[in-house]
Amino acid sequence: MTAAHVAAPEPGQYELSHLRLLEAEAIHIIREVAAEFERPVLLFSGGKDSIVMLHLAIKAFAPARLPFPVMHVDTGHNFDEVIATRDRLVAENGVRLVVASVQEDIDAGRVVDNGPSRNPLQTVTLLRAIRENRFDAAFGGARRDEEKARAKERVFSFRDEFGQWDPKAQRPELWNIYNGRHRKGEHIRVFPLSNWTEYDIWAYIGAEGITLPGIYYAHTRPVFQRDGMLLAVHPYMQPRDDEEVFETSVRFRTVGDVTCTGCVESTASTVEDIIAETAVSRLTERGATRADDRISEAGMEDRKREGYF
């Protein structure tokens, strides 16, 4: 009796697309953290990367609810559209939101607001919130393509009892095996989007129909130029006497504190337009539009060593 012939599958028939492989990796990481840690939290600002991360986390546990809260480290200097999107997504998905306020730390005298940007002050607020809520793992939306300090950071990034990161003492990560071991007072930062690029993020947003704040798409806004960056006119960001204000079509590639987040001239008003624009860009979004990364060549690494995102 001869064995029945089984036809080989057509090439690519059972292969996952590039985006679905990234999605599967991120969901695996999120589930791994939920299984391994007692009190994880997802850092959620209402920006595109954290929205994608929340979308993946909801997918990871559907139809059940998200088994951990989300936390926003709030400088108080936010774009209104971003906060509105944050609150809407939290309400729609029945997620518990923890807001860690930089203003509270200023009022309590734990930090000094020397202005104009409160971005450096976020580290103190973040570490306080992690300590007070006894979080032992914190999901972040950082990607390796954004900045060179982030490029060398592990998916599971160990932080000591002071919240500090030592790039020379990182743990090996073999394939999809992650080491979350830590002692009381220490914690792990987890980056499920480490291997994604800005292009991947936008392609996934398009594929999944994810809604973002309107400032990510081209719109007309009064802006002024400072240190080679376009900054939006805002109650927390005003031009100097010698800086000319003009209106033009812009969009934001990344969103953070109003005082240090620039925009780029663009007419890309759809996901497809932005994907095409991103494909030919030669600057990362942080390199092009974040003043806080221009403090020094090692600005991001120095802040991460102190406990920054």
Curated annotation (Swiss-Prot):
Keywords: ATP-binding, Nucleotide-binding, Nucleotidyltransferase, Transferase. GO terms for biological process: hydrogen sulfide biosynthetic process; sulfate assimilation. It comes from the Bacteria. Pathway: Sulfur metabolism; hydrogen sulfide biosynthesis; sulfite from sulfate: step 1/3. It is an enzyme of class 2 (transferase). It catalyses: sulfate + ATP + H(+) = adenosine 5'-phosphosulfate + diphosphate. The keyword DNA-binding does not apply. Its EC number is 2.7.7.4. SUPFAM superfamilies: Adenine nucleotide alpha hydrolases-like. InterPro entries: PAPS_reduct_dom (IPR002500), Rossmann-like_a/b/a_fold (IPR014729), SO4_adenylTrfase_ssu (IPR011784), Sulfate_adenylyltrnsfr_sub2 (IPR050128). GO terms for molecular function: ATP binding; sulfate adenylyltransferase (ATP) activity. With CysN forms the ATP sulfurylase (ATPS) that catalyzes the adenylation of sulfate producing adenosine 5'-phosphosulfate (APS) and diphosphate, the first enzymatic step in sulfur assimilation pathway. APS synthesis involves the formation of a high-energy phosphoric-sulfuric acid anhydride bond driven by GTP hydrolysis by CysN coupled to ATP hydrolysis by CysD. Belongs to the PAPS reductase family. CysD subfamily. PANTHER family: SULFATE ADENYLYLTRANSFERASE SUBUNIT 2. Heterodimer composed of CysD, the smaller subunit, and CysN. This is Sulfate adenylyltransferase subunit 2. The gene is cysD.
